A protein has these predicted regions:
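A short helix-loop-beta-strand connector motif used in the catalytic cores of GNAT acetyltransferases and
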Residues: 44-58, 80
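Conserved GNAT acetyl-CoA-binding A-motif
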Residues: 107-119
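Conserved acetyl-CoA pyrophosphate-binding loop and the N-cap/start of the following alpha-helix
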Residues: 90, 94-102
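Conserved beta-strand in the GNAT
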Residues: 58, 65-73, 80-85
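A short beta-loop-alpha structural element at the N-terminal edge
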Residues: 4-18
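Conserved active-site alpha-helix within GNAT-family acetyltransferase domains
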Residues: 97, 109, 121-129
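Conserved GNAT-fold acetyl-CoA-binding loop/helix
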Residues: 18-46
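A short, internal acetyl-CoA/4′-phosphopantetheine-binding micro-motif in the GNAT/acyltransferase core
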Residues: 84-91, 119-121
Length: 129
């Protein structure tokens, strides 16, 4: 099966912190943000909570293994992206954008007002968002 995006399932939860750590290594190349590479990740329990809400999606490779994820939570009529991470080996291939588009499609189909994300705008890969 080709790489694709699907809703996360409980068995994915223990795999997601590794992806977040891998993705965060890219911050080492940004002055003043290297500390993010060593920052705490979302806990497995928090991932399980978001998976239970059906607001967590994973980008899986051709072998079906998660390589990226987007975790979000509904706040009133908004969907807030809590974490978006793509492992280094899949970065630069559009998977982050596809995950965001998936969350936006979810928000539209559930008649939510907007999708929010808190990010660093001066980081090149964050700028489009």
């Amino acid at each position: 099966m080709p790489a694709h995006i699907r809703l996360a399932v409980p068995a994915d939860a223990p795999l997601l912190p590794r992806i977040e750590r891998s993705a965060a290594q890219a911050f080492r190349s940004i002055d003043g943000l290297g500390w993010l590479a060593d920052a705490a990740t979302l806990s497995v329990e928090r991932h399980r909570q978001l998976i239970a809400l059906s607001t967590c999606w994973v980008a899986v490779d051709a072998q079906g293994q998660p390589q990226g994820f987007l975790s979000a939570e509904r706040h009133g009529s908004d969907l807030h992206i809590e974490e978006l991470s793509v492992c280094q080996s899949m970065q630069g291939q559009g998977w982050g954008r596809k995950l965001v588009e998936t969350a936006m499609d979810h928000a539209r189909s559930n008649h939510l007002r907007c999708v929010t994300l808190t990010t660093f705008t001066h980081v090149p890969w964050n700028a489009p968002f």
